[in-house]
From Swiss-Prot:
Assembly behavior: Part of the 30S ribosomal subunit. Contacts protein S5. The interaction surface between S4 and S5 is involved in control of translational fidelity.
Protein localization: Plastid, Chloroplast
InterPro entries xrefs: Ribosomal_uS4, Ribosomal_uS4_bac-type, Ribosomal_uS4_CS, Ribosomal_uS4_N, S4_RNA-bd, S4_RNA-bd_sf
Keywords, sorted A to Z: Chloroplast, Plastid, Ribonucleoprotein, Ribosomal protein, RNA-binding, rRNA-binding
UniProt name for this protein: Small ribosomal subunit protein uS4c
PROSITE patterns assigned: RIBOSOMAL_S4 (PS00632), S4 (PS50889)
Amino acid sequence: MSRYRGPRMKIIRRLGSLPGLTNKVLRSKPGYTDQLISNKKVSQYRIRLEEKQKLRFHYGLTERQLLKYVRIARKAKGSTGNVLLQLLEMRLDNVIFRLGMSSTIPGARQLVNHRHIMINDEMVDTPGYNCKPRDIITLKNISESRSGIPKGIDSSQRSRTPNHLVFDSSRGVGFVNQIIDREWISLKINELLVVEYYSRQA
């Protein structure tokens, strides 16, 4: 399954807030959501499926990519769900988003694909690059690249920068201090349901 490129509001109308996908706020009709819930008996499979979809759309992954991360997480020490979230959070496109260099993960991916991002003074054009502690992330040709950073995002996005990241706005430089803690993951997700969904595939 390829990466989703359709209307983003359609996705958050079905799955709820996904800050990595879009920063737009859905305005639902009064009683619309409650009516949908009351008229449908939701199966356990559907609940697990929707949690998986939240993860996939928030981080902008294909089905194959997400399954690959699940398989890696299963082989690692510790809780599979926690390891899975850590792997996704440490992707370069997500780290750029969490640093406040982009308002969405698709926007961050565009910065990477257009070769605006350097890690430890080396150009990186792979959005799925696995960031590590002590990595230094900078904007290549900062005067040009800054034009791609949305204005007004500093106060809102960067005020919520997780504790494993630091951003120096004066230099346009981000620092990775450590692997992210579960409590600093902004997405409202039950990762155990995602693991259960893939239990027969991974």
